Design a protein with these regions (language model features):
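Flexible, low-complexity junctional segments that flank or bridge functional domains
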Residues: 1-107, 115-121, 136, 178-180, ...
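Conserved acidic, small-residue-rich alpha-beta core segments centered on
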Residues: 86-223, 228, 233
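C-terminal cap/linker of serine protease catalytic domains
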Residues: 233-239
């Protein structure tokens, strides 16, 4: 059994469970698998570690209502390996007030190398009659943010009040296809290429707006360099 891991193993981890626990503290709240906390500088923090399970609309209303008093919001999707595209879309829909073109998707139409359909527009529509975030937000990413999370980051990156901070995502936006070869090997690959609004391929990852790596000096002091960069950014762009 072997797996190709170079696409994230050759990059900095840029995430630490133990340091994150320091930031969350013992009194953090949890809803639909998301952990959230309000930092002492009045910046809200949500950690979304997976899109595998559904996120309830009522749960999102509750979380965003509680955090509405904050000056800015950090959404951390580092080490989120994806899950359901609909769940990722549901979360992103809370950050726009209008319908936005976020990209294009093609589908395989035949056995040939280039047998794909004409790219079809993908739109993000706001969650109407639901609580939507109106202030600045930052999304934290690393190379282990992939699959449906890559799609989430693409949707968020195009929004005017959202900034991506951290490392390049792991890619893999396209809908996965799984099969087994005659020798018993399992193969899994993206069968539906996805592009951003400028028709740039998303398969190999999305660059952050502001690239930040966690420094070893900070880590020794239980400080998350990427979270601190996000806090600094939100304070300097406070509305």
């Amino acid at each position: 059994y072997s797996q190709y891991r170079e696409w994230f193993d050759s990059y900095p981890a840029n995430f630490s469970d133990s340091i994150q626990r320091v930031y969350l503290g013992k009194d953090y709240a949890q809803s639909s698998g998301m952990k959230y906390q309000i930092f002492e500088d009045n910046i809200a923090y949500i950690y979304c570690g997976s899109f595998q399970s559904g996120i309830g609309e009522g749960n999102l209303d509750e979380v965003l209502n509680k955090l509405a008093i904050c000056d800015g919001l950090i959404i951390d999707v580092r080490n989120n390996s994806g899950g359901n595209l609909t769940t990722a879309e549901k979360l992103a829909a809370r950050f726009t007030n209008e319908k936005v073109l976020v990209g294009y998707m093609s589908h395989k139409t035949g056995p040939g190398h280039n047998d794909f359909s004409t790219p079809k527009a993908v739109w993000l529509e706001p969650s109407l009659d639901r609580v939507r975030w109106q202030k600045q937000a930052v999304v934290l990413t690393n190379r282990r943010s992939f699959s449906a999370t890559n799609d989430f980051v693409n949707r968020m990156k195009i929004l005017p009040k959202v900034t991506i901070i951290g490392d390049k995502t792991g890619g893999g936006s396209g809908l996965p296809f799984s099969s087994e070869l005659p020798n018993g090997w399992s193969v899994r690959f993206s069968a539906s290429p996805m592009y951003d609004a400028d028709m740039q391929h998303l398969e190999f990852g999305i660059d952050p707006d502001i690239k930040v790596n966690m420094s070893s000096e900070d880590m020794q002091r239980n400080v998350d360099t990427i979270i601190e960069a996000a806090r600094e950014y939100l304070h300097s762009h406070k509305e």
